[in-house]
């Protein structure tokens, strides 16, 4: 009998965005993307939620970071 590939009752770990007052000083804004900044060679999205920014995990491509930001906006229905 073969073993199942993944553990059945394992909890799914989801990313909880860090809250920051602003993107860090050394982050470089990517002009072609609304929420994407370059940080230590990776792409990070910062989405303004009320008084603070939510920070995405680091991505290797800016499109992924922007997609994350769009999803966060949709989930929280942020209106401009």
Swiss-Prot record:
The keyword Cytoplasm does not apply. One of its GO terms (biological process) is cell division. InterPro entries: CedA-like_sf, Cell_div_activator_CedA. GO terms for molecular function: DNA binding. Gene3D superfamilies: Cell division activator CedA. The keyword Ribosomal protein does not apply. Keywords: Cell cycle, Cell division, DNA-binding. It comes from the Bacteria. It holds the Pfam family CedA. Belongs to the CedA family. Activates the cell division inhibited by chromosomal DNA over-replication. This is Cell division activator CedA.
